[in-house]
């Protein structure tokens, strides 16, 4: 059985590291389109607490999560989480 790895994406919000496909910046037109499409489908999770969106997390279930922390910070937490899991086995 695979253990659940979690990543803090800011303000006490957590996502499953096992479900993350991509962590991207929200500035490009294709990413803005992905956000709009997810909102229309009801699969957008806004975890920014009213702050500016700095990272967009795309999951394998087609959910899109908006975060107010930088993509590099989320990616670093992702890597640290994976390394900690590898060292515990």
Swiss-Prot record:
Cysteines paired by S-S bonds: none
One Pfam family matching this protein: RemA-like
Signal peptide residue numbers: none
Coiled-coil annotated spans: none
Protein family according to the UniProt entry: Belongs to the RemA family.
Name of protein: Putative regulatory protein PCC8801_0196
Origin species: Rippkaea orientalis (strain PCC 8801 / RF-1)
């Amino acid at each position: 059985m695979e253990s659940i790895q979690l990543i803090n994406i800011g303000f006490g919000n957590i996502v499953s590291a096992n479900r993350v496909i991509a962590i991207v910046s929200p500035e490009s037109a294709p990413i803005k389109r992905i956000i709009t499409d997810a909102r229309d489908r009801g699969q957008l999770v806004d975890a920014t607490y009213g702050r500016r969106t700095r990272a967009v997390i795309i999951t394998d279930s087609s959910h899109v999560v908006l975060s107010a922390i930088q993509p590099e910070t989320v990616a670093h937490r992702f890597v640290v989480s994976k390394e900690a899991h590898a060292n515990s086995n």
